[in-house]
Amino acid sequence: MPVYQLIPEIPLFPPIEEAEDDGLLAVGGDLTKERLLGAYRRGIFPWYEVGQPILWWSPDPRLVLFPDELKISRSLRKVLRKEQFEIRFDTAFQEVIKSCADVRTKQGKGTWIIPEMQQAYTELHQEGFAHSVESWLDGKLVGGLYGISMGQCFFGESMFSTMNDSSKVALVALADFSQRVGIKLIDCQMTTPHLLSLGAREIKREVFLKMLKNHLETPSIKGLWNNDPVSMKVNLLQN
């Protein structure tokens, strides 16, 4: 199948069914708020590296995590009970997204979180769509994740850790928060052994798109997410 070339400033996408076997749907376009939010509503996300045009993907199958299916290992439960990390929401979004990029670079891996992407998602954060979940230790950011929240869905983009289990604790906090505010689906996009071990599972793209349509009918939670350290501590210890 041909890969569609998108026209900048016209936020349209071809039918999802036109995607390549690897999930590649289109190239080009831009990273405006309208384009990005329109993409997520359709089950599409950008993923590309320096020197490449913007690449838009919709893989089949799709990796998702239902918040109540998160698997918490015995060792992670011990970490949660120690209350080692302080969890915060939306207090250091730019630092989280930059750390996600920097950690991958230091590990010798390529990163799609290039400066243009960081800027685009920071603007979405300022608009109340993009959020960060952060693990702090002694006043220092040591792990976290970020993504887009729309309707009853959270579209996870990336996570990082500079200490063992710090990103896992952030994911536990996200799953807990999701259940409390009515988020039904966490989109993990691409399949990885790490996410599978935490309870994520693959579903067919057509099933994902039906879920997406249903869950996006609910109004989005816009604005900064509430930070409540007392209730967060209680909920984490209940896992």
Residue ranges and their predicted role:
Residues M1-N239:
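N-acyltransferase acceptor-side catalytic subdomain
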